[in-house]
């Protein structure tokens, strides 16, 4: 007997059942009543009754079979395995259908794509002249367009391809995340935009810095060293590398050493403002050896501290390459060893400049103009060390002035050796002093030859008042006796009945080292920052 029926399902499909009754089941009719159909469908195995049934059915394209109604465990197992198989087939079909749209690339594919993008970026950089060899391992933009944006931004800051090649790692900085925040912070501090180009050329690493973690603490530390907030931008412009130093490293040790040798604590802010490079100097390798060498030459440590307060840039002089060779050159030009301390104290720059060419030029000029004996050049330097930096034109003008005043070449030479300042004083003031000397004092020219330092004294403040007192008292004296003393000493001399020649100081240009060791007067100013100026053509008032 075969029974075929169908029933409704929620999903599309239809049910086919092939029923095979047991062998003892007598079939008399080709059709079944409704009750028989219900009994067959609702058949349950009764205890003790063994009825073997074979049911085959198909739903849509899936087939199920059961060999025995008395084996439900086997049926469930079969159904479970069939269901698992169908799930695997469904997953495979789904994977094949959606692979092209939702598949995730493998790590190998990602690395290949990354390498291809990096190759395009390198190709772009090489095309504009940048060598990307040092960029391996550095995180770079994914596309050449983003890299182009970075290069163009650096160009707007004034950096050239050569500048970028000098530090190609700058290409690893994001414009929005790194460059713009750093530059905005520097601008808010007061660093001038016109200095950004040179700033970045000297210290491009600043673009890698974090404003909060790296830059702000350094600025706060500088202010803690008594550098005024208004001076901080100038300090950064002059020495941008300071932004990369550790707070507890070289900066703190260099300041501590300077205070230890006698530099006044209140002067530290001004010193660092004028010469912030000190913050990057190692004490053991740079500062301490120079200070100790000055002591060997005869300059006490406290005097060296005062020199640093006045001229902090002397700490930047190379000891072995410049300072020691210059000291030897001075001795080669007949400067006495005992005079070296006073020479350096008066003009510290003399140990840091390119000295020999200057001395050769000065010797040649004076030998030609006033027939100077080369051996006399040493005494001239001892009296005025700044002489080595005077320009040719001002000196010739002063020599011409003296000869026009009536002095011979020999007298002019004697005056220059006795008081080299006559080669550098303000010519207008010298003319006024000479006119007063001639018309009011009516002294012979030889008095000026004997005491050429007359031109170094203020006409209104010193020369005229003292000359009037000398005339009033009817004293006849030399210019040196009248001028080469303090106001207090001069008043004492006016009370004398006779002139004591021994009181006359024969060398008014001598330098007293003790005056250098006296503490400086504290002067307040709006800003301690002063640009170092070239004093080559400076005239002494």
Curated annotation (Swiss-Prot):
InterPro entries per record: MTERF, MTERF_sf
Protein's UniProt keywords contain Transcription regulation: yes
Location relative to the cell: Plastid, Chloroplast; Mitochondrion
Acidic residues: compositionally biased ranges: 521-541
Comp. bias regions, Polar residues: 507-517
UniProt transit peptide range: 1-45
Region described as Disordered: 66-103, 503-541
Coiled-coil region list: none
Stretches with biased composition (Basic and acidic residues): 85-99
Alphabetical UniProt keywords: Chloroplast, Mitochondrion, Plastid, Transcription, Transcription regulation, Transcription termination, Transit peptide
Phenotype when the gene is knocked out: Embryonic lethality when homozygous, due to growth arrest at the late globular stage.
A GO MF label: mRNA binding
A Pfam family this chain is assigned to: mTERF
One Gene Ontology term from the biological process aspect of the record: regulation of DNA-templated transcription
Remaining remarks: 'BELAYA SMERT' means white death in Russian.
Function statement: Transcription termination factor required for processing and steady-state levels of plastid transcripts. Required for splicing of the chloroplastic Clp protease (ClpP) group IIa intron. Required for maturation of 16S rRNA and 23S rRNA in the chloroplast. Essential for embryogenesis. Required for the maintenance of the correct levels of transcripts in the mitochondria and chloroplasts.
Name recorded for this polypeptide: Transcription termination factor MTERF4, chloroplastic
Organism: Arabidopsis thaliana (Mouse-ear cress)
């Amino acid at each position: 007997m075969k029974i075929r029926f169908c029933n409704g399902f929620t999903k599309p499909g239809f049910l086919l059942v092939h029923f095979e009754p047991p062998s003892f089941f007598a079939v008399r009719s080709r059709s079944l009543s409704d009750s028989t159909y219900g009994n067959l469908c609702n058949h349950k195995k009764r205890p003790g009754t063994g009825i073997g049934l074979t049911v085959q059915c198909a739903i849509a394209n899936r087939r199920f079979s059961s060999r025995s109604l008395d084996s439900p465990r086997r049926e469930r197992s079969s159904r479970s395995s069939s269901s698992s198989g169908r799930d695997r087939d469904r997953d495979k079909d789904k994977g094949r259908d959606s692979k092209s749209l939702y598949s995730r690339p493998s790590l190998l594919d990602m690395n290949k794509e990354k390498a291809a993008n990096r190759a395009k970026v390198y190709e772009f950089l090489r095309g504009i002249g940048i060598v990307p060899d040092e960029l391996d391992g550095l995180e770079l933009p994914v596309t050449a367009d983003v890299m182009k944006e970075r290069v163009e931004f650096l160009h707007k800051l004034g950096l050239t391809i050569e500048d970028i090649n000098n530090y190609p790692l700058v290409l690893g900085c994001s414009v929005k995340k790194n460059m713009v925040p750093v530059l905005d912070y520097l601008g808010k501090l007061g660093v001038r935009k016109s200095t950004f180009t040179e700033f970045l050329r000297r210290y491009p690493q600043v673009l890698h810095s974090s404003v909060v973690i790296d830059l702000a603490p350094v600025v706060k530390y500088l202010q803690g060293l008594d550098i005024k907030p208004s001076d901080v931008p100038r300090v950064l412009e002059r020495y941008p590398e300071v932004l990369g130093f550790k707070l507890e490293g070289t900066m703190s040790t260099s300041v501590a050493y300077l205070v230890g040798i006698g530099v006044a604590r209140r002067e530290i802010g001004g010193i660092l403002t004028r010469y912030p490079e000190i913050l990057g100097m190692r004490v053991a390798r740079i500062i301490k050896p120079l200070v100790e060498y000055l002591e060997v030459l005869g300059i006490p440590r406290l005097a060296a501290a005062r020199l640093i307060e006045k001229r902090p840039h002397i700490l930047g002089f190379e000891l072995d390459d410049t300072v020691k060779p210059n000291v030897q050159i001075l001795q080669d030009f007949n400067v006495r060893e005992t005079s070296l301390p006073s020479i350096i104290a008066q003009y510290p720059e003399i140990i840091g400049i390119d000295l020999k060419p200057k001395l050769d030029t000065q010797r040649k000029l004076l030998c030609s103009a006033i027939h100077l004996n080369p051996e006399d050049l040493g005494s001239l330097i001892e009296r005025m060390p700044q002489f080595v930096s005077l320009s040719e034109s001002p000196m010739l003008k002063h020599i011409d002035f003296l000869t026009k005043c009536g002095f011979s070449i020999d007298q002019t030479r004697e005056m220059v050796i006795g008081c080299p300042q006559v080669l550098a004083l303000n010519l207008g003031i010298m003319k006024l002093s000479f006119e007063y000397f001639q018309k009011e004092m009516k002294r012979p020219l030889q008095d000026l030859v004997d005491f050429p330092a007359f031109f170094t004294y203020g006409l209104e403040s010193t020369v005229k008042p003292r000359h009037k007192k000398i005339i009033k008292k009817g004293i006849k004296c030399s210019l040196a006796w009248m001028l080469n003393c303090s106001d207090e000493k001069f008043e004492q001399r006016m009370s004398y009945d006779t002139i004591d020649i021994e009181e006359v100081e024969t060398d008014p240009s001598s330098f007293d080292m003790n005056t250098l060791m006296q503490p400086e007067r504290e002067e307040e100013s709006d800003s301690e920052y002063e640009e170092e100026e070239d004093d080559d053509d400076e005239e002494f008032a």
